[in-house]
Curated annotation (Swiss-Prot):
InterPro entries to which the protein is assigned, alphabetical: Ribosomal_uS7, Ribosomal_uS7_bac/org-type, Ribosomal_uS7_CS, Ribosomal_uS7_dom, Ribosomal_uS7_dom_sf
Subunit structure: Part of the 30S ribosomal subunit. Contacts proteins S9 and S11.
Family membership: Belongs to the universal ribosomal protein uS7 family.
Source lineage: Bacteria, Pseudomonadati, Myxococcota, Myxococcia, Myxococcales
Gene transcribed to yield this protein: rpsG
Gene Ontology BP annotations: translation
Protein known as: Small ribosomal subunit protein uS7
Native source organism of the sequence: Myxococcus xanthus (strain DK1622)
Record-linked NCBIfam families: rpsG_bact
Length: 156
C-alpha cells in the first residue's frame, strides 16, 4: 500500500454537444494518441447515425446500451496455499462504467462495417437491444462469477 496521500479524482466537464459527463468519458476512452477532436467526430458521427437509423434520442440509446453492458460481478484471482482461485467480487460503480465503455469500444472495433462511426453506432444499438458482443462479454463475466460462487468466502 502506498503511504502517500490519495490523489484527488479529476473533474470531468460535460461535453459541448450533449452537456453530459458520460459522453465526455466515452470520448476520452475512444481517444487515441491525444487526438480528441477525431474521437469527438467519431462519437458524434455514431450518435448521428443512431438518431438516423433508430429514430430516437442517441443519448438515451447510449445510456440504455451502457446499462445493458455494465457488469455487476467479476472474478479476481486469489492465491491461497499454492492454489489460485477465481473469487467473485462485486464491481464498484465507477469501474462498472469504465468496463462497459471499454467493452463497447473494443467490440465495435472488431465489427465488420467500414468506418468506425458505423461500427460504434452498430454496437451501441445492439447493446441497447441486449444483443452484440459487448453484452455477451458481460454475460460471460457473470457466468464466471456464478460458476465460482463457492469461493466467495475468500473475498478480501
Amino acid at each position: 500500500m502506498p503511504r502517500r496521500r490519495v490523489v484527488a479524482k479529476r473533474k470531468i466537464l460535460p461535453d459541448p454537444k450533449f452537456q453530459d459527463r458520460l459522453v465526455t468519458k466515452f470520448v476520452n476512452d475512444l481517444m487515441r494518441k491525444g487526438k480528441k477532436s477525431i474521437a469527438e467526430g467519431v462519437c458524434y458521427g455514431a450518435f448521428a447515425l443512431i438518431e438516423e437509423r433508430a429514430k430516437e434520442d442517441p443519448l438515451k440509446t447510449f445510456k440504455k446500451a451502457l446499462d445493458n453492458v455494465k457488469p455487476v460481478l467479476e472474478v479476481k484471482s486469489r492465491r491461497v496455499g499454492g492454489a489460485t482461485y477465481q473469487v467473485p467480487v462485486e464491481v464498484r460503480q465507477d469501474r462498472r462504467v469504465a468496463l462497459g465503455m471499454r467493452w463497447i469500444i473494443t467490440y465495435s472495433k472488431a465489427r465488420g462495417e467500414k468506418t468506425m462511426q458505423e461500427k460504434l453506432a452498430g454496437e451501441i444499438m445492439d447493446a441497447a437491444n441486449n444483443r452484440g458482443n459487448a453484452v455477451k462479454k458481460r454475460e460471460d463475466t457473470h457466468k464466471m462469477a456464478e460458476a465460482n460462487k463457492a469461493f466467495a468466502h475468500y473475498r478480501w
